[in-house]
């Protein structure tokens, strides 16, 4: 997801060269401050392979004039569209028997308060109450820690096939 934030920031002229991790995403979130997102058409697609595409959203951003008010509005619209896209994707991939299972939100994009708060609100309306990391940051380090924990649990439960794959 993070690269979508980087691309959006570049398309809006907020950060063309990133020297530090998350600079582009932070500028995008800052640009949206104080703006209410517009009601827009669906600007994402869930592809036949189950992946999420934000290309329609990127096309809209590419057409945004680079004046400060338009960039600020487009930034707010981006955050809203991403939250709605993720919610739609999660709800489509979650079957009725899985709605009560824990859903963990992990990755650096969940440091973005605007998008994360909106996503949690949308999922809550659907009866899904996701888990967010509080003991460790949700970025790459936290994701790696979670992966290591799951691998240790799978090994302990005998779900590893002796190699590096989890047995069904």
Task: Briefly describe each language-model feature range.
Residues 1, 103-110:
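Glycine-rich beta-strand-to-loop/alpha-helix junction loops that act as flexible
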Residues 3-101, 114-124:
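A contiguous, well-structured pocket-lining segment that forms one wall/lid of small-molecule binding clefts
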Residues 4-6, 13, 110-111, 135-137, ...:
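Short, glycine-/Ser/Thr-/acidic-enriched flexible segments
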Residues 75, 79, 108, 134:
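Glycine- and other small-residue-rich loops at beta-strand/loop junctions that grip anionic moieties
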Residues 81, 85, 110-113, 139, ...:
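C-terminal region/appendage detector
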Residues 86, 105-108, 119, 145:
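Hydrophobic, well-ordered secondary-structure elements that form the walls
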Residues 102-103, 113, 119-143:
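Conserved phosphate-binding/catalytic loops in two-lobed NTP-binding clefts
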Residues 131-168:
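Glycine-rich phosphate-binding/hydrolytic loop that grips phosphoryl groups
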């Amino acid at each position: 997801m993070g690269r979508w934030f980087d691309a959006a920031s570049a398309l809006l002229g907020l950060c063309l060269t990133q020297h530090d991790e998350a600079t582009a995403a932070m500028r995008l979130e800052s640009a949206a401050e104080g703006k209410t997102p517009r009601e827009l058409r669906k600007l994402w697609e869930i592809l036949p392979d189950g992946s999420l595409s934000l290309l329609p959203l990127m096309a809209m951003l590419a057409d945004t004039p680079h004046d400060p008010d338009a960039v600020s509005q487009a930034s707010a619209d981006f955050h809203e569209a991403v939250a709605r896209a993720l919610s739609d994707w999660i709800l489509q991939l979650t079957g009725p028997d899985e709605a009560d299972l824990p859903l963990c939100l992990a990755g650096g994009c969940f440091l973005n308060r605007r998008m994360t708060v909106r996503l949690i609100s949308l999922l809550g309306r659907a009866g899904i109450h996701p888990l967010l990391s509080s003991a460790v940051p949700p970025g790459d380090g936290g994701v790696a820690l979670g992966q290591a924990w799951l691998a240790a649990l799978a090994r302990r439960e005998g779900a590893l096939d002796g190699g590096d794959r989890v047995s069904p």
